[in-house]
């Protein structure tokens, strides 16, 4: 009886002890599991792919003294998002964001002399942006051997299999950031990224929410999704163009079929105009019903395989002009505003025995006016009475050539023998006599450059097995198609020399081959690169084909094949580079006959054009003016101010006022008003001015009232940007940085900013560029500081030993605060250099004087001074950048200013960054010491003999 309760108590105690032991064991297991999870998670995050989309290459190992401990958290911070680089092209540095969230630890670095303390940097680490190659662009293709005699002129990358050639759904650009991923638990982040990439691979055509790639939208009831396909899926709040919803897909007449192809659905959602969407629907349905593309085409060539005549180049053959020399019809297809370069090229190719037919792009009205003046000077020069808006890769270019051929054949007073197409970026590399002698010897031949690779690969690479449609100045990819049976498809370069017999055949023949090929190539990408080749190879004239277009093209695919045309073509393409002086030896080769070269661009390098011109025709007399100068118009009064942006209109007005102040201070004498002026109206014209291939500033032609006589005068002001790049003092031990600049419209191919002068406003998205010398791998820190010392962005860039250029566009919230910004570059947090750029306050909005509410909205900086989601405020004391309350208050008052107060603020900023170098009068002036523009060396009215066209010389030439 007594033993039983004791036994029960003992059992209860044992049970309690067992529970306690199990609890302790469970806690120990939980702790161990947590620590192991943290360790594996950190390892996984350190080795995982970067957020930002796309495949990321591993960074090259840096020297030990440059290595930095990377934070474990790979949050997709806005400061290191991977899609921002490039001058608007969306292909900037391959960025790897590491860190970026407040409170994340950052590895300490060894302190160096003069370095900022690393402890102060811990609360706000900089994201690391790894730039893998010299231009912030990583390519998986093997390096090419540069051959001076290579003339493979296809406009599509050689490694096209590795390139994403779709523009479906959200265009396949890397996302600037994925803020939702940064907030997810680390264990789910990789899974979400993997799922997102799989979805992108599967359904790039998922344009409509809830629709799979194979689902059908009923005709007549296709509303586009709320997000435009030209935008990212998650557009960051700093985005300038809100864009709104995609246009609703409406038709005048519903399509005659169900539009089910993902390419067509994507095109419908992205097309802007109702007419274009109607055309897309009709074209797709006709193709789907088998009514659009020919299935079989007749081959008329009697030869088996591909004919290729060999022609020999004999320098001695040009010593004797043939008895019946050929006469050439030059067809110049030009666009842009480089009228002086065009005139110089025209001067080099002109001969009274040839004919010149010029087509100017429908959008290039200034150039059209200049070309019309040229045509009035010479009877053998005519301008097409019709104009097309040709785009890269578009079917409109082939239409332009075919219509030009028809026009030339109908000109009975022009007895030409050869058709040669040129652009303003071409230049002859041999003389007219040499060209005529060669073509006279081979007058029955046709000269086209073939692709030189296997045909199946060429068809895939060129997209010939895809259906394209041009509308809204865009080439839309609508689906797949079959190559017609019965013919051999060929192609290569779209620059060619064709004899008259073949041009007549292509133009007037109604046989099965020509008729069906015109239909087939009306819906083809880059049709001029294949149409004439294919027709010639399958025609009765097939034995006249020479696999040489007599050109040298400067292909540098490492720089020129970055899919820079995806905003106008649903495909990936290339563009040749401009020639530089170091390329001159290529023009002297004699291995094969070549007579023209491209591309040349005077705003990039005019020296090479001069070298070639002097080589062909001799030097100009000593003392000839303007040989090292180049002027290019960017605005002309007949264009109308609607052709200008508010930023350029604002700054052009300020430049003109800067010139008038120079006239008053340097030309004015006390007691007289003869050199004092009051500005009147908008600028009349604006030119870029270059000297010795260096940008010298803008030339502003403007009207002003002379206060002494109250008469209107026309003046021209030269303004030059001040030097803003500055090496730190005392200089650091780091010597790789050569130059740094900020601007927009970065051209990664030519590695310069196309926005010459860096004219920026509050709604622009600037790009930071750095130029490097050779040296060891290093990591530098870049810091962007606004006019009131708010740190807008900071990030690190890994610079490889062979890097030459890097560029990055930080995703800043807009509007930017107007004023002078500073970009600092540090190495181990030791200042290396800095550069400045101006964000101009706008005096115009929609080309009208800005209203107070608009000014306050644009000029007060971003909401809550937050340029990014992350704050860098703690770096201000570390970088000795105090925020002055009085300066902030003055900025607030400036933001609310309008009228003369706003102009005064703007002009003070412009005067700090630009210098009025000189001013002149284009006509009569009451200012006795004012020089005449035509007598200066810098004015757009000064002599320019190299581009001026005069009377035909006795030898029939102009040059």
Curated annotation (Swiss-Prot):
Function per UniProt: Catalyzes the first step in the biosynthesis of chondroitin sulfate and dermatan sulfate proteoglycans, such as DCN. Transfers D-xylose from UDP-D-xylose to specific serine residues of the core protein. Required for normal embryonic and postnatal skeleton development, especially of the long bones. Required for normal maturation of chondrocytes during bone development, and normal onset of ossification.
Phenotypic consequence of residue 598 to A: Strongly decreased enzyme activity
Taxonomic classification: Eukaryota, Metazoa, Chordata, Craniata, Vertebrata
Tissues expressing the protein: Widely expressed. Expressed at higher level in placenta, kidney and pancreas. Weakly expressed in skeletal muscle.
Family to which this protein belongs: Belongs to the glycosyltransferase 14 family. XylT subfamily.
Its EC number(s): 2.4.2.26
Residues with glycosylation annotation: 226, 421, 777
Pfam families, per the entry: Branch, Xylo_C
Record annotation: effect of changing residue 471 to A: Strongly reduced enzyme activity
Gene Ontology biological process terms, A to Z: chondroitin sulfate proteoglycan biosynthetic process; embryonic skeletal system development; glycosaminoglycan biosynthetic process; glycosaminoglycan metabolic process; heparan sulfate proteoglycan biosynthetic process; ossification involved in bone maturation; proteoglycan biosynthetic process
One GO CC annotation: extracellular space
Annotated phenotype, changing residue 747 to G/E: Reduced enzyme activity but does not affect UDP-binding
Pathway: Glycan metabolism; chondroitin sulfate biosynthesis; Glycan metabolism; heparan sulfate biosynthesis
Start and end residues of each stretch annotated as Disordered: 42-259, 940-959
Mutagenesis or variant effect for residue 115 to S: In PXE; acts as a modifier of disease severity; results in higher serum xylosyltransferase activity
Name of the protein in its database record: Xylosyltransferase 1
Keyword Glycosyltransferase: yes
Post-translational modification summary for this protein: Contains 7 disulfide bonds. N-glycosylated.
Ranges of Basic and acidic residues composition bias in the record: 145-161, 177-204, 249-259
Cysteine disulfide partners in this protein: 257-285, 301-542, 561-574, 563-572, 675-927, 920-933
Residues that, per the record, bind UDP-alpha-D-xylose: 333, 361, 390-392, 494-495, 575, 598-599
Catalytic reaction(s) noted: UDP-alpha-D-xylose + L-seryl-[protein] = 3-O-(beta-D-xylosyl)-L-seryl-[protein] + UDP + H(+)
Topological domain ranges for the Lumenal compartment: 39-959
Effect the entry attributes to changing residue 557 to N: No effect on enzyme activity
Listed Gly residues bias regions: 78-104
Source organism of the structure: Homo sapiens
Residues in compartment: Cytoplasmic: 1-17
């Amino acid at each position: 009886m007594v033993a039983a309760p004791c036994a029960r108590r003992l059992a209860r105690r044992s049970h309690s002890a067992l529970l306690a032991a199990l609890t302790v064991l469970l806690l120990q297991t939980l702790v161990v599991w947590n620590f192991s999870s943290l360790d594996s998670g950190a390892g996984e995050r350190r080795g995982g792919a970067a957020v930002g989309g796309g495949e990321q290459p591993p960074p090259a190992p840096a020297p030990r003294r440059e290595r930095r401990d990377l934070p474990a958290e790979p949050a997709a911070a806005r400061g290191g998002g991977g899609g921002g680089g490039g001058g608007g092209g969306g292909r900037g540095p391959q960025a790897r964001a590491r860190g970026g969230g407040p409170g994340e630890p950052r590895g300490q670095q060894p302190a160096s002399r003069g370095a900022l303390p690393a402890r102060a940097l811990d609360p706000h680490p900089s994201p690391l942006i790894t730039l893998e190659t010299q231009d912030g662009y990583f390519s998986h293709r093997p390096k090419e051997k540069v051959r001076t005699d290579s003339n493979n002129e296809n406009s599509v990358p050689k490694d096209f299999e590795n390139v994403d050639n779709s523009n479906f759904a959200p265009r396949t650009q890397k996302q600037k950031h994925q803020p939702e991923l940064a907030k997810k638990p680390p264990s789910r982040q990789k899974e979400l990224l993997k799922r997102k990439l799989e979805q992108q691979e599967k359904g790039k055509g998922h344009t409509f929410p809830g629709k799979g790639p194979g689902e059908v939208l009923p005709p007549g009831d296709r509303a586009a999704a709320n997000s435009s396909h030209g935008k990212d899926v998650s557009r960051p709040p700093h985005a300038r163009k809100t864009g709104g919803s995609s246009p609703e897909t409406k038709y005048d007449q519903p399509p005659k079929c169900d539009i089910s192809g993902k390419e067509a659905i994507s095109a419908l959602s992205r097309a802007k105009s109702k007419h274009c969407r109607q055309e897309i629907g009709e074209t797709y349905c006709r193709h789907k019903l088998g009514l659009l593309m020919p299935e079989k085409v007749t081959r008329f060539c009697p030869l088996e395989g591909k004919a290729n005549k060999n022609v020999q180049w004999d320098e001695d053959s040009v010593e004797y002009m043939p008895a019946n020399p050929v006469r050439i019809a030059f067809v110049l297809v030009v666009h842009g505003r480089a009228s002086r370069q065009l005139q110089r090229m025209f001067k080099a190719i002109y001969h009274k025995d040839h004919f010149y037919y010029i087509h100017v792009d429908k959008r290039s009205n200034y150039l059209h006016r200049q070309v019309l003046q040229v045509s009035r000077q010479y009877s053998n020069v005519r301008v097409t009475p019709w104009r097309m808006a040709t785009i890269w890769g578009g079917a409109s270019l082939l239409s332009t050539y075919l219509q030009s051929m028809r026009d030339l054949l109908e000109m009975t007073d022009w007895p030409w023998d050869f058709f040669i197409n040129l652009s303003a970026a071409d230049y002859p590399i041999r003389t007219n006599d040499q060209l005529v002698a060669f073509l006279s010897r081979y007058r029955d031949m046709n000269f086209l450059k073939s692709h030189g690779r296997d045909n199946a690969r060429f068809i895939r690479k060129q997209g010939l097995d895809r259906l394209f449609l041009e509308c809204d100045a865009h080439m839309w990819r609508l689906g797949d198609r079959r190559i017609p049976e019965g013919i051999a498809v060929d192609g290569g370069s779209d620059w060619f020399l064709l004899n008259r017999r073949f041009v007549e055949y292509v133009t007037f023949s109604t046989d099965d081959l020509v008729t069906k090929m015109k239909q087939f190539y009306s819906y083809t990408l880059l049709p001029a690169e294949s149409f004439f080749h294919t027709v010639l190879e399958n025609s009765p004239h097939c034995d006249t084909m020479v696999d040489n277009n007599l050109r040298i093209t400067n292909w540098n695919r490492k720089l020129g094949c970055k899919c820079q045309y995806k905003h106008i073509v649903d495909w990936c393409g290339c563009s040749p580079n401009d020639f530089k002086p170091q390329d001159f030896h290529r023009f002297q080769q004699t291995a094969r006959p070549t007579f023209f070269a491209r591309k040349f661009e005077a705003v990039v390098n005019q020296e090479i054009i001069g070298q070639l011109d002097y080589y062909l025709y001799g030097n100009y007399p000593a003392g000839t003016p303007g040989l090292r100068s180049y002027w290019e118009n960017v605005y002309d009064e007949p264009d109308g101010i609607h052709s200008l942006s508010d930023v350029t209109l604002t700054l052009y007005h300020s430049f003109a006022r800067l010139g008038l102040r120079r006239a008053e201070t340097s030309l004015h004498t006390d007691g007289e008003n003869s050199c004092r002026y009051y500005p009147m109206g908008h600028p009349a014209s604006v030119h870029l001015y270059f000297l010795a291939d260096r940008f010298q500033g803008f030339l502003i032609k403007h009207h002003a009232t002379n206060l002494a006589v109250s008469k209107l005068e026309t003046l021209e002001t030269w303004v030059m940007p001040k030097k803003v790049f500055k090496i730190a003092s005392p200089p650091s031990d780091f010597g790789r940085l050569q130059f740094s600049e900020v601007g927009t419209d970065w051209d990664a191919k030519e590695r310069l900013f196309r926005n010459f002068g860096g004219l920026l406003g509050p709604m622009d998205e600037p790009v930071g560029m750095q130029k490097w010398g050779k040296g060891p791998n290093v990591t530098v820190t870049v810091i962007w500081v606004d006019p009131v010392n708010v740190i807008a962005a900071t990030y690190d860039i890994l610079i490889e030993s062979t890097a030459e250029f890097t560029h990055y566009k930080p995703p800043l919230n807009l509007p930017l605060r107007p004023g002078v910004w500073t970009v600092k570059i540090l190495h181990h947090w030791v200042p290396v250099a800095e550069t400045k750029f101006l964000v101009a306050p706008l005096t115009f909005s929609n080309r009208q004087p800005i209203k107070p509410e608009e000014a306050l909205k644009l000029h007060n900086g971003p909401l809550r001074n937050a340029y990014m989601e992350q704050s860098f405020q703690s770096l201000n004391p570390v970088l000795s950048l105090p925020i002055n309350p009085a300066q902030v208050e003055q900025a607030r008052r400036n933001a609310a200013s309008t009228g003369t107060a706003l102009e005064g603020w703007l002009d003070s900023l412009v005067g700090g960054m630009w210098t009025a170098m000189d001013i002149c009068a284009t006509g009569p002036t009451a200012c006795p010491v004012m020089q005449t523009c035509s007598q200066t060396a810098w004015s757009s009215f000064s002599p320019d003999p190299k581009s001026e066209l005069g009377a035909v010389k006795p030898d029939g030439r102009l040059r």
